[in-house]
């Protein structure tokens, strides 16, 4: 996907400027016909040149290629993209966890001030003999005295190939201008209100709710905090329970069920009128499985019985209460149940959940898919996972992108969303938080993610993974300070909500019509004539054609 604007390439690696890293590493220059190379270029207009460098004879994972970055090229507080193409020699096969997997993770690092600080610049896992586009990002806090880019990562003996590596300063303002135009097409619609016989009457249209929900996780502690409840009820639409629905919480000890905490949170959601996502039925990562489940993990029959009892117990109790469920959390990063019960158990979880609560949308949910720098969690791997579940009869109803982001780059997020949209499944950002100590930069980072999500037609909602200092899983991510004051990031969030809310006023024209363009959602219109005032509620749904409403019929 080509960018709609030209970002600033601050450093372009010279193919002959590479130096070997490691005493045994040898570099050589090569050329390949560009017509045979991939043409994708995420967020920049450059295509592969065909000129690349091979690093052979590597004796260690840290060995590879390095090149000094032009002094003064990198500035603090600027978000940089790392772009280019990386490969490994044909025939190389990686081995991970005892299973043969094609490809090796290759990492790009920015080593600052003679290596005293190493900044992650992204990673890819190319298939041998094929090129993969790197989509990393980084940001520096201070002006560096020196900086160098290093490419490394695979085991000793694996030859690394690098082509057209660039460091690009992102232009967020230009990107935001593009996204505002895109948002107008994706999230708004022309509306015509008709009231015959009353030309010149005064009209006021107010949007009550946006059709794009924004939510937050909650827990039993924060709902006792008045400042939290005030921000949540005034600025957020949905909820998700931080821990209280997870299996390790509802059944920490075998047979000792605790649904009281989840029930209290559901009561809170009912009182405040907020739907809640069901997170999660299972968790695929070994470290997030409670001990008694691990203890029976070697007994297939016992473990399968526990899995089925969990599904029946949870969904039998709460059928119809949660519009969404994350079924088996983080399957790109964990295989606890599949390794012990077979790959089909993941689809079985979906099949049985669908039978018990057919009205709920059943989600996959994982992290790093949107950031472009986790070789285990690429959009392509996520799509492969989803297709495999569907072949097994799983009724996958949605895609969850957790959104635990650092230094987000809009075009990389958009590229992931574009790829996932090919599944025709709705996408939600399910656990958004932005880690950044500087509140002004945190606000900018938050805006990057929210604008990309809101402007993309595949995304149907965003849920924050908390927002209040002292009550979040992640440090330096709050929108509201511990004393209840709203910080820069929180103000930015409120401003975006205000920007995405329509308000129109004017008069009926000579044909008795009032026209406006508004965001999808629910509205009330007040028409004032000589005979008095009329209030009418209506909904603006998605659609390309203008929505024409006769005020006497609504």
Name each model-derived stretch.
Residues 1-217, 222, 226-230, 234-235, ...:
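Extracellular and organelle-lumenal recognition/adhesion modules and their flexible linkers in secreted
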Residues 143, 531-554:
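Structured interaction patches on ligand/partner-binding surfaces of diverse proteins
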Residues 168-220, 247-250, 263, 293-295, ...:
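Beta-strand-rich domain onsets/edges
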Residues 220-233, 304-314, 376-389, 413, ...:
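Short, acidic/polar
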Residues 238-252, 261-370:
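Substrate-binding cleft and catalytic face of glycoside hydrolase catalytic domains
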Residues 258-275, 338-365, 376-441, 450-460, ...:
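Glycoside hydrolase catalytic-domain groove-lining segments
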Residues 509-518:
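Short, surface-exposed beta-strand/beta-hairpin micro-motifs centered on an aromatic residue
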Residues 521-531:
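A short, solvent-exposed beta-strand micro-motif common in secreted/extracellular proteins
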């Amino acid at each position: 996907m080509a960018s709609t604007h030209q970002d600033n390439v601050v450093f372009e690696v010279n193919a002959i400027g590479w130096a070997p890293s490691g005493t045994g590493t040898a570099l050589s220059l090569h050329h390949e016909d560009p017509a045979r190379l991939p043409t994708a270029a995420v967020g920049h207009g450059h295509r592969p040149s065909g000129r690349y460098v091979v690093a052979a004879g590597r004796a260690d994972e840290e060995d590879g290629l390095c090149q000094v970055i032009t002094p003064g090229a990198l500035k603090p507080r600027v978000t940089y993209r790392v772009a280019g193409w990386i490969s490994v020699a044909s025939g190389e096969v990686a081995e991970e966890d005892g299973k043969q997997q094609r490809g090796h993770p290759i990492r790009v690092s920015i080593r600052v001030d003679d290596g005293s600080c190493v900044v992650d610049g992204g990673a890819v896992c190319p298939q041998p003999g094929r090129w993969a586009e790197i989509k990393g990002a980084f940001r520096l806090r201070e002006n560096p005295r020196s900086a160098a880019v290093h490419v490394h990562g695979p085991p000793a003996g694996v030859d690394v190939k690098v082509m057209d590596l660039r460091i690009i300063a992102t232009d967020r303002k230009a990107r935001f201008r593009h996204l505002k135009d895109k948002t107008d097409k994706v999230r708004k619609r022309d509306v015509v209100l008709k009231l015959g016989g009353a030309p010149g009457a005064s009209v006021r249209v107010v949007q009550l709710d946006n059709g794009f929900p924004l939510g937050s996780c909650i827990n039993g502690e924060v709902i006792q905090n008045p400042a939290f409840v005030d921000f949540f009820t005034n600025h957020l639409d949905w909820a998700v329970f931080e821990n209280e629905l997870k299996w390790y919480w509802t059944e920490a000890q075998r047979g000792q069920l605790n649904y009281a905490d989840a029930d209290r949170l559901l009561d809170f959601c009912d009182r405040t009128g907020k739907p809640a996502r069901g997170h999660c039925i299972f968790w695929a990562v070994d470290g997030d499985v409670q001990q008694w489940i691990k203890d029976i993990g070697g007994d297939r029959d016992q473990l399968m019985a526990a899995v089925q009892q969990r599904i029946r117990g949870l969904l039998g109790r709460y059928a119809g209460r949660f519009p969404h469920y994350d079924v088996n959390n983080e399957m790109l990063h964990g295989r606890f149940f599949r390794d012990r019960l077979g790959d089909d158990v993941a689809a079985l979880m979906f099949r049985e959940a669908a039978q018990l609560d057919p009205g709920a949308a059943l989600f996959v949910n994982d992290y790093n898919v949107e950031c472009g720098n986790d070789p285990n969690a690429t959009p392509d791997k996520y799509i492969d996972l989803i297709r495999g579940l569907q072949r097994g009869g799983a009724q996958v109803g949605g895609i969850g992108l957790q959104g635990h982001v650092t230094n987000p780059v809009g075009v990389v997020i958009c590229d992931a969303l574009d790829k996932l949209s090919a599944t025709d499944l709705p996408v939600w950002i399910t656990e958004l938080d932005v880690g950044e100590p500087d509140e002004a930069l945190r606000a900018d980072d938050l805006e990057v993610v929210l604008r990309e999500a809101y402007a993309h037609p595949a995304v149907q909602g965003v849920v924050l993974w908390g927002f209040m200092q002292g009550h979040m899983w992640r440090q330096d991510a709050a929108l509201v300070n511990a004393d209840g004051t709203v910080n820069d990031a929180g103000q930015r969030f409120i401003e975006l909500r205000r920007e995405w809310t329509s308000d129109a006023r004017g008069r009926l024209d000579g044909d008795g019509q009032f026209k406006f363009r508004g965001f999808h959602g629910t509205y009330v219109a007040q028409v004032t004539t000589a005979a008095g005032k009329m209030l009418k509620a209506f909904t603006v749904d998605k659609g390309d054609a203008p929505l024409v409403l006769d005020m006497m019929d609504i």
